[in-house]
Design a protein with these regions (language model features):
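Class I SAM-dependent transferase core
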Residues: 1-73, 103-118
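Short loop/turn and capping residues at structural boundaries
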Residues: 22, 48, 87, 123-126
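Acidic, metal-associated active-site segment
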Residues: 59, 81-84
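Short, charge-rich binding segments
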Residues: 65-66, 87-89
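Short, flexible active-site-proximal loops enriched in glycine and acidic residues
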Residues: 74-75, 97
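Class I SAM-dependent methyltransferase "Motif I" SAM/SAH-binding loop
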Residues: 76-80
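S-adenosylmethionine
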Residues: 83, 90-202
Length: 202
C-alpha cells in the first residue's frame, strides 16, 4: 500500500473520503510541515515522526462536523492546522486562515500556493480584524476555551459554531458564559487526540 493509499484508508476510518489528489496533497503537506514548520517552531520537533497522526489525522477528524458550512475560519492557524487539512478535504468550503504573526502567515501563503488550495485564503492579522461573519471557527492549540470563545463569538454568524480541539489530557470544561456546548466528540482510533468541543451562542 502506497503512502497516499494508506492515508485514504486512515481517513476513511474517520468518516472522511479522500480522492487520490486530495490524499497526495495532504501527504505533501506532511513533508512541508517537517521541512518548514518544525524549523520555524510552529510544529514541535518531537512530532517529526508522528506528523500524520498528531496533526493531519487529528485535523481531518473535524471535516465531517462542518460539511454543511460555507465559510470557516481557522483562528491562529499557525502552520494551517486544521484549516489547510479541512480545506483540502472539503473543497466546497471556503476557509480563512487567520494568523497575526508575519512569519507564520508567510508560511501559510507558501503552503496554500504550493498545495493549490484554491478555497483557502490567508488573513495576516488579528481575529478581531478579520472579515466575517463565518459559519464555523476552528481553535486548535490557539487559546484556553474561555479565551477562544471570547474571540470566536465576535466573528460567528447567528447559529455559527466554534469547533474547539481540547487537549488529550483535558477534562471537558463547562461552557463559557454566553455559550452552550452542542456536542463533545471523541475519536477512539486516534489515541493521542482529545475531544472536539462544539459550541454556539446561548
Amino acid at each position: 500500500m502506497s503512502d497516499t493509499e494508506g492515508l485514504r484508508a486512515q481517513a476513511g476510518s474517520l468518516g472522511v473520503v479522500l480522492d487520490p489528489s486530495q490524499a497526495s496533497r495532504l501527504t505533501r503537506f506532511e513533508e512541508l510541515l517537517a521541512d518548514r514548520a518544525i524549523p520555524l517552531g510552529v510544529v514541535s520537533p518531537s512530532d517529526a515522526n508522528r506528523i500524520r497522526e498528531r496533526h493531519i489525522l487529528d485535523s481531518l477528524r473535524a471535516a465531517p462536523v462542518v460539511e454543511d458550512a460555507d465559510l470557516a475560519a481557522d483562528l491562529g492557524s499557525g502552520a494551517g492546522l486544521p484549516g489547510v487539512v479541512v480545506a483540502i478535504a472539503l473543497p466546497r468550503l471556503r476557509m480563512l486562515l487567520v494568523e497575526r504573526r508575519p512569519r507564520r502567515a508567510a508560511l501559510l501563503e507558501l503552503v496554500v500556493e504550493e498545495l493549490g488550495v484554491s478555497n483557502a485564503t490567508v488573513f495576516a492579522g488579528r481575529v478581531a480584524e478579520m472579515p466575517g461573519p463565518v459559519d464555523v471557527a476552528f481553535a486548535r492549540a490557539f487559546a484556553p476555551l474561555d479565551q477562544a470563545w471570547a474571540q470566536a463569538r465576535g466573528v460567528l454568524r447567528p447559529g455559527g459554531r466554534l469547533v474547539y480541539f481540547a487537549g488529550a489530557a483535558t477534562t471537558i470544561p463547562t461552557a463559557p458564559e454566553g455559550a452552550v456546548i452542542l456536542d463533545v466528540l471523541r475519536t477512539p482510533v486516534l489515541e493521542s487526540s482529545g475531544a472536539l468541543v462544539i459550541m454556539t451562542r446561548q
